[in-house]
Amino acid sequence: MEGPEIKAVEAVIDNGSFGKRTLRFETGRLAQQADGAVAAYLDDDSMILSTTTAGSSPKENYDFFPLTVDVEEKMYAAGKIPGSFFRREGRPSSEAILACRIIDRPLRPLFPHTLRNEVQVVETVLAVNPDDAYDVVALNAASASTMISGLPFEGPVSGVRLALIDGQWVAFPRWSERERAVFEIVVAGRVVENGDVAIAMIEAGAGKNAWHLIYDEGQTKPDEEVVAGGLEAAKPFIKVICEAQAELKKIAAKETKEFQLFPEYTEDLYNRIDEIAHADLDEALSIAEKLPRQDRIHEIKEGVKATLAGEFTDMEDAEKDKEIGNAFKELQRQIVRRRILTQDYRIDGRGLRDIRTLSAEVDIVPRVHGSALFQRGETQILGVTTLNMLKMEQQIDALSGPQSKRYMHNYEMPPYSTGETGRVGSPKRREIGHGALAEKALVPVLPSREEFPYAIRQVSEAIGSNGSTSMGSVCASTLSLLAAGVPLKAPVAGIAMGLVSGDVDGQHIYKTLTDILGAEDAFGDMDFKVAGTSEFITALQLDTKLDGIPADILASALQQAKEARTTILEVINECIDGPAEMSPYAPRIITTTVPVDKIGEVIGPKGKMINQIQEDTGAEIAIEDDGTVYISSEGGEAAEKAKEIIDQIANPHVPEAGETYNGKVVKTTSFGAFVNLTPGTDGLLHISQIRNLANGERIDAVEDVLKEGDTVEVVVQGVDDRGKISLAIPGFEDQESSAPRRDRGDRDDRRGGRGRRDDRRRSDDRDDRDYDDRPRRRRSDRDDDRDYDDRPRRRRSDRDDRDYDRDDRRSSRSDRDDRDYDDRPRRRRSDRDDRDYDRDDRRSDRRRGSRRDDRNPRYAADENYDEYRADREERSERPRRRVRRDFDPFED
């Protein structure tokens, strides 16, 4: 789509040796019905659509400006499908919420605070380069769309992210470049009348690799002077982007609309309240304790309402109450600010640089891995640390940037912390922002994964609030982490700075406050939070109610904050000067390495091996792609056992004959049991050996003695050429695992070389048997209906179920009756002759018939039969043929 309605401007960011970045603003193509719509492009590679829309009617019952900023992360922007059940975007991520705060903070002060029409700014991420962050681009797009929307907006305001890389401040750094950043800073500002840039918002922190870069590679340390230099370095980039937005406004802006403004109070009402309550408020605002001060102020306010009950009768009651409240609050604000500007006198009587009473304590919560309580005045923070396996680190489904987070900092502020009631549940935007700031302050001093292979969750409970709970969270977290045994590279402390500005004797002056109260935050012009070690800054955040603050004032505030930070660090070091012994309830994590090609063996098919190790030892195991294995358990003994098993898999020991093992039965078969000796190594315990566990008695099934999961002591009999391991019961090593087959000689043909059947000599002791020695007929001469069956022999139980006449079978078998057939190998004739038994008894036994469990004495002994049968089943499962032959007694 092309045409004169599409208008665009560009801002070129020159980073010298790091190249140029181009920021382009385009309007007229997309979202044409919004009050203001701008598509912002970074190098024509990342694209964000920003829209600004105002409500048609004001919300008269509101006593604040209703501005809403939303960031819509579209997963298609990164070529992804959402991972949720419904496969669509849901609630905003933490990254989106932090981006909303970065946009809201510099935009809000530039609107009239008496505007009551709803204003909504929506940032839709349409495309993003995985190596770029979108938040600062969205900030500039939001300002541009608001500039052309026709709203009363004192812009433009623009922002830039700078990274200190190899001594140079680089604008709009890529994620890959930020790996070598010592310090990162997001600065938003606007160009004032004298051409200078006034700072409106700062969000900054040391890089995650800052400690290594500073102390191992000698990079620049981000102290107060360096950070102040970063603020100055941001000004040229801010000015270039503001100029591009101003040009876009000239060519594409709508005419500014007229919006009704709602003054908070009338001048007459304010003067009357000042006359009635000034002296009482001046006294009440000198009470140091928060709750008694609030109670006294409430009494004064009720007295003012009673006094004015008969005055200003032309106003409706609801409107009158609202204006009285607004005017009364403004009077408090003026009293507090005037005393600071003219007398350097604060609410609780402190000087401008004084810190409230500090206290620190560790190990106050039982059983948790680490805990601490930090208190500064009436601000009270409980820090709790939890350690776990690296596999518990947070996985982030982000459009770009890091996809996981090992250190997770959660900030929570329940309503009782201020003596109020309210909703308790999911975190609000403010809580997410405070947690992210505290996390940013501590990440640079955390040990590396190799030094401390734990996932760390830190929770800051703001159980008492009267100013700067976020910086109190940094202090409490330092104490808690050290109490949990986390080897921090240095302790970190934080302090909140305030600012009051105004005209005194015709001169505009600024007063910087150290360790501000909640009331000073509400009535002041700035909330400037600074955290760091004794040597450099690790985190920085600035919010202001002014259009902008001179950079030299901020530089002075940084130096003042360092003094306070040093004092707090002394208190922390007195409480705990290093990492404590880890809690007995914390997991002990050890590491080992396995060759990459052995990872599959450690995991096993479908995770069978690793799950078995975890089940047997009680340890938890996590394996990295490079072969690093992390093993954890409470107490450490289970972890050591699991490590030993994993090492055996990675460097297996081949069992040798004579070695004894306590193995677990992993499988049973009809011929024996497979026993696990070492991880991944099994051996066969033959059924003939298993009988020794049953006192040598015959067993019908292996499961009668051993079942899967049983533990049995075995000794290695031998290992064949294929690596197959045969096992034995200790004490029976010399016993063969199967009956040996005797030498049957050269069998010549299927008859075994014993000559013709009719020529064989029969023993005289068999003359009384009903045998027929006449020549057999050829098979073709036999009757076609002969009872001949070459099917596999059925089990006896199957045959008995058949409906046939057993008498016919007996008659065809001659004197064999219904004897159970036995296919065991026959003994040699000499063995049978040596037996001392009565042949008549044998015949009578045949006539009586034999039971299933009877053993025919002319066959091998029971134990040899069992061995032969097991060996035969192991070698072959071919069906056995039974051939039935009948003889004609009348044939010559």
Swiss-Prot record:
Cofactor(s) the record lists: Mg(2+)
Keyword Metal-binding part of the UniProt annotation: yes
Binding site for Mg(2+): 521, 527
Known EC number: 2.7.7.8
Swiss-Prot/TrEMBL GO biological process terms: mRNA catabolic process; RNA processing
Function: Involved in mRNA degradation. Catalyzes the phosphorolysis of single-stranded polyribonucleotides processively in the 3'- to 5'-direction.
NCBIfam families from the UniProt entry: polynuc_phos (TIGR03591), pppGpp_PNP (TIGR02696), PRK11824.1 (NF008805)
Protein name: Polyribonucleotide nucleotidyltransferase
Source organism phylogeny: Bacteria, Bacillati, Actinomycetota, Actinomycetes, Bifidobacteriales
